[in-house]
UniProtKB/Swiss-Prot annotation:
One Gene Ontology biological process: D-ribose metabolic process
GO cellular component: cytosol
Catalytic activity as recorded in UniProt: aldehydo-D-ribose 5-phosphate = D-ribulose 5-phosphate
Enzyme Commission designation: 5.3.1.6
Protein name from the UniProt record: Ribose-5-phosphate isomerase A
Source domain of life: Bacteria
Alphabetized InterPro entries for the sequence: NagB/RpiA_transferase-like (IPR037171), Ribose5P_isomerase_typA_subgr (IPR020672), Ribose5P_isomerase_type_A (IPR004788)
Disulfide bonds: none
Lineage: Bacteria, Pseudomonadati, Pseudomonadota, Gammaproteobacteria, Chromatiales
GO molecular function annotations of the record: ribose-5-phosphate isomerase activity
Gene giving rise to this polypeptide: rpiA
Biochemical pathway: Carbohydrate degradation; pentose phosphate pathway; D-ribose 5-phosphate from D-ribulose 5-phosphate (non-oxidative stage): step 1/1
Binding positions (substrate): T29, G30, S31, T32, D82, G83, A84, D85, K95, G96, G97, G98, K122
Assembly and interaction partners: Homodimer.
Length: 221
């Protein structure tokens, strides 16, 4: 039986084939991405640097001496590599279990290609079993929670957690997400919401899944 960590490592290392020399690489956040950062260290001299989606990833990149650049100073970024908490077969994702969803969404949007890396347990038929994170400006927390209840969710404050942007996160359970694009837009239109963890308007372009049989590659249908 292969462990989840083995699957994550396989997928993360497979993403290295998308890394081009002399380019800037977008780097996500989380346990799977940490394996990618470890692999990226071996070719740090051959890339122009990285754009990081969180303070945690920035710290790990700098540990290896990999340059971290400000997105505002970067022109084109061929790829962004990140994990997911769930993916459907259309490569629409739930992300943000680690709390870095807003910066992840920004860096993903700025990249030409989004390569998602995960172990095979993350592939689901319908999104929503994993609680959907919503980043909220603190003063709007109660109002946003009431609006999320109207959408059929059960929001819960992620206690003791503040995002890199100084905001709070509501984790929303009980959503069977049949129309991810529509729900992503609906939630983002609630005043006080910074963004939510649905990556449906900008899904992944490639999904690499670590399985016992090797790395399985899916592209958006």
């Amino acid at each position: 039986m292969m462990s989840a960590d083995q699957g994550k490592r396989m997928a993360a290392e497979a993403a290295m084939e998308y890394v081009e020399e002399n380019t800037v690489i977008g780097v996500g956040t989380g346990s799977t991405v940490n394996f990618f950062i470890d692999a990226l260290a071996d070719m740090k001299a051959r890339i122009d640097g990285t754009v990081s989606s969180s303070e945690a990833s920035t710290a790990r990149l700098r540990q290896y001496g990999i340059p971290v650049l400000d997105l505002n100073e970067v022109g084109t970024m061929p790829i962004y590599v990140d994990g997911a908490d769930e993916s459907n077969r259309f490569l629409q994702l739930i992300k943000g279990g680690g709390g870095a969803l807003t910066r992840e969404k920004i860096v993903a949007a700025a990249a030409e290609r989004f390569v998602c890396v995960a172990d095979e347990s993350k592939l689901v038929d319908v999104l929503g079993e994993f609680p959907l994170p919503v980043e909220v400006i603190p003063m709007a927390r109660s109002y946003v929670a009431r609006e999320l209840v109207k959408l059929g969710g059960r929001p819960q404050l992620r206690s003791g957690f503040t995002t890199d942007n100084g905001n709070v996160i509501l984790d929303v359970r009980g959503l069977k997400i049949m129309e991810p694009i529509k729900l992503e837009q609906q939630i983002n239109n609630i005043p006080g919401v910074v963004t939510n963890g649905l990556f449906a308007l900008r899904p992944a372009d490639v999904l690499l899944l670590g399985t016992a049989e090797g790395v399985r590659k899916l592209t958006a249908e």
